[in-house]
Regions:
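Short N-proximal segments of mature Sec-exported proteins
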Residues: 2-51
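Compact alpha-helical subdomains of small soluble proteins
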Residues: 30-104
Length: 104
């Protein structure tokens, strides 16, 4: 994973985590939260598969979470992250869908 892709993946992880912990009063579809959590898991798994040390990955995600936590749901950014993930990770869309099915 290139440094540019890693930075984007961290940003997307932060956006996805913010989606999961939306402030009260925000409207959203529950399936969006499921897809966001599954996407975080798939991005981390892929990062580890490509040789990024887990501590390095987690540090980057934590910084991104701090950046986006408490923000309102941004459908455009979320969709851009889905497109990024699906382009970056082979079978990314299928991997996310598979994880969604195992969340419960």
């Amino acid at each position: 994973m290139s440094d540019t892709d890693k930075t984007k993946a961290w940003d997307c992880s932060g956006i996805y985590m913010a989606n999961y912990f939306l402030p009260s009063g925000e409207t959203f579809e529950y399936s969006m939260k499921e897809k966001s959590m599954a996407s975080v898991k798939v991005l981390k798994a892929y990062a580890l598969e490509t040789g990024i040390p887990e501590t390095n990955w987690d540090e980057g995600v934590n910084k991104a979470v701090d950046k986006y936590y408490g923000s309102k749901y941004d459908k455009v950014k979320t969709e851009q992250c889905h497109t990024f993930l699906e382009g970056l990770i082979p079978n990314g869309k299928e991997r996310v869908n598979k994880v969604v099915q195992t969340l419960y």
